Amino acid sequence: NVLEAQGDELRRLIDGASAGGATPRLIVCTDCESLASVSPLAAPDIIVFDESFTDSQVPFGAFAARRSLLRHWSKRGMTIFHSTTYQPNTISTLHMLHCLRRARPDFMERHAATLARIARDFDFRGRVFAERYSRSLARLIRTVGWHETEVKTSGHYVEIGGRRIFDGVGGVACSIRGHNPPDYLAEIDRLGDPQACREELAARLLELTGLAHATPAVSGASAVEHALKLGLASQYPRERVLVMRGGFGGKTLFALTGTWKTSLRRGIDPLYPHVVYVDPFAADAVTAVESAFERHPIGVIQCELVQGVGGVRPLPADVLRCLAKMRDRHDCLLFVDEVQTGVYRTGPFSRSAELGVQPDLLAVGKGASDMMFPYALTLHSQAIEERLAARHCDLAAVLRSRYDYELGMRTLLNVLRHAAERQLPETVRERGEQFQRVLGEMLRGCGNVREVRSFGLLIGIELEAGAGFRRWLSRVRQQLVLLAMLKHPRMPLLVGYCQYEPHVLKLTPPLSITEEEVENVCETISSVLRLPLSKAVWAGLRPLPKTGSLKSREITI
């Protein structure tokens, strides 16, 4: 109501600033109830939709923007800039539609014909997607032949037009037992009383991590933000964060503190300024860490034990020992980001436990969702809790009230029970060793493969990058490799590359992958990587085999 009354004044201020050479944007945040009043406001540039559109039952967020602003997300190189741009949570989105149908039946009725056509007409769907969402992503979908095909997921496979493709990405390390676990609803329902579930989850997490306090989050990036906020609040006035270069904290504003790649931070300054970066792979890394503590009041150390986005590279043991020593010597906090390595991805619940490292702060995500709803968690020590209490800081309680939702909590508890019952750590370790052994044997002598690195079921295959023209040729070949694996005649495989290191093929299969599937996936990878360039071109660019008529399949909205 206040914004509606002041709409004309806001627009006048913006026009005045624009006349002075600035280009401010008006961003309006709306809930479901006030949606109808947005249009006559001061013609906002961006409209943000909050979780009231899902009755605050599951995480949801979206925005609409002027075409001139949204164009930035569609230009070359931005197609998969942010994971939620190309893989929004389907269940949360469908729930939003159901809630909107109840709350605004007039709106849904007004657009019913368009929605029905989107559901049944692939060509129309593609045009709307390109115009309203992302032209570059629409082009990518056409390139891989998915633009006129119904896509389904079940277990370890994505089915496209009747053709099953093994999902070796799984939301980039989210997949515990594949897509759409058939018993999920019954398992969640059997967990019983919510308070009893919370107490059991807390007890299990304490046993697994040694950390007594948990703060829920709705993404890995928000879990990283929680950790940094809690850590720095307890360490005040020490405001410096020591970050290992090559890390990836996420793409929200504070999580970018731990995201090393400058191109991901460019253009959205100012970010948190009190950050010191050290290259953990440099020959003088230990000296650089010690020097950073001599020059700066370090409050929090942030690191990943395996840099998943940065090439599936483990933090050197001597650097890790140095960080632990500096933590103890200078009474700072060790924050280990295990959003990608945690929840059994490398075998145990956390790689920290496997390496004998006791963090003060620990972020987990990905697998915590069971590939269903977005969920993540920040764990912190009793010492941090006591420091916050002594400062009368209620930040942890505020974050819990904002980010907690029952279904996410139940989902993680169900994952922990599932892992214990099926001895998941041992299974993941065995499958990881199998991948390392079989890929090592199959790729031995392959000229364009430098190394295979396996940490449980977080696997990187480093290819020759080359330089100059050879580097350009390698990049072209690498894209053809992905397409050739996707179109493999016996075991089609969906896989990707590391974002920082595009010459490192990255595989994050479901933790429930079978021995036979490991063998078949390795055979696909080996057969494609051994192709000469001319055959790789044909294998990557040949049309996808078609199964039946794909023009008029329907989906339900």
Describe the residue ranges of each PLM region:
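PLP-dependent aspartate aminotransferase-fold enzymes
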Residues: N1-D8, R12-D15, A202-C303, Q307, ...
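Conserved PLP phosphate-binding loop immediately N-terminal to the Schiff-base lysine helix
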Residues: V2-E9, T23-S52, E304-A317, D331-L355
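N-terminal glycine-rich, Lys/His-bearing helix-loop that initiates the first secondary-structure elements
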Residues: L13, A17-S18, L100-G210, S549-L550, ...
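Helix C-cap/helix->beta junction micro-motif
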Residues: A17-P24, M326-H330, C446
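Active-site C-terminal subdomain of aminotransferase-like
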Residues: A43-F124, E354-E441
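PLP-dependent enzyme catalytic core of the Aspartate aminotransferase-like
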Residues: R102-T114, A420-R422, Y500-I557
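Conserved small-domain helix->loop->beta segment predominantly found in fold-type I
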Residues: R120-L137, I141, R437-L473, R490-L505, ...
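Conserved C-terminal alpha-helix-loop-beta "cap" of PLP-dependent enzymes
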Residues: K152, G161, N448, L458-T508, ...
